[in-house]
Curated annotation (Swiss-Prot):
GO molecular function: (3R)-hydroxyacyl-[acyl-carrier-protein] dehydratase activity
Compartments, record wording: Cytoplasm
Catalytic reaction list: a (3R)-hydroxyacyl-[ACP] = a (2E)-enoyl-[ACP] + H2O
EC number: 4.2.1.59
Name of this chain's protein: 3-hydroxyacyl-[acyl-carrier-protein] dehydratase FabZ
Coiled coil residues, start to end: none
Pfam families registered for this protein in UniProt: FabA
Length: 163
C-alpha cells in the first residue's frame, strides 16, 4: 500500500475502495482520519444515516444499527490497517504472493460487547490497534465510539488471504 503516505493521515472513501474489496451495501466506512504503522493503530469514521438499508427492518419504529454491522465496520477498519502495514508486517507473505490479490478476512471475534444503540445521525468513530501477529493471522483490539462514549468493543482476528 505504498501509494498511501503516512504523512497524510486522511484516506477518503475513494482511497478506501482502493484498499478494500467491499462494495455497497457492505462498504461501511466513510473515511480514515488517522493511522500509524509504528503505533499499529487506525481511526475510521462511519456516518450513520436513516438511508441505510438495514434501518428498513431493524427497527422501522426505532431504527438501530445492528451490532453485527458495527463489528463489521470495526473489522473493515482493522483490515485497512493490516493492508497499510502489509509491506512491513507481512513482507514474507507479500513476497510469496506473486502479485496476486490478497486481503484481510475476518477469522475470529472475541470479547464483543455492545454497550448502547447506534442510531441515525450518529458518527461512529472506530479505533483499532494490532496487538499480535503470527504468520498470516493478526489480532486487534477495537472499539467503536459515538460522542466519545464506547458503544461497542471487540477483539478481532483476521487472516491475510488470497481472493
Amino acid at each position: 500500500m505504498s501509494q498511501f503516505d503516512e504523512k497524510n493521515k486522511h484516506i477518503d472513501v475513494m482511497g478506501i475502495r482502493k484498499i478494500l474489496p467491499h462494495r455497497y451495501p457492505f462498504a461501511l466506512l466513510d473515511k480514515i482520519v488517522d493511522w500509524s504503522i509504528e503505533d499499529r493503530t487506525i481511526v475510521a469514521h462511519k456516518n450513520v444515516t436513516i438511508n441505510e438499508d438495514f434501518f428498513n427492518g431493524h427497527f422501522p419504529e426505532f431504527p438501530v444499527m445492528p451490532g453485527v454491522l458495527i463489528v463489521e465496520a470495526m473489522a473493515q477498519a482493522t483490515a485497512i490497517l493490516g493492508e497499510l502495514m502489509a509491506e512491513t508486517l507481512f513482507a514474507h507473505v507479500v513476497a510469496k504472493a506473486g502479485g496476486g490479490r490478497r486481503t484481510f478476512m475476518l477469522a475470529g471475534i472475541d470479547k464483543v460487547r455492545v454497550k448502547r444503540p447506534v442510531v441515525p445521525g450518529d458518527v461512529l468513530v472506530i479505533e483499532s490497534r494490532m496487538v499480535k501477529q503470527k504468520n498470516i493471522i493478526c489480532t486487534a483490539e477495537s472499539v467503536a465510539k459515538v460522542d466519545g462514549q464506547i458503544v461497542c468493543s471487540a477483539e478481532l482476528m483476521a487472516a491475510y488471504k488470497d481472493y
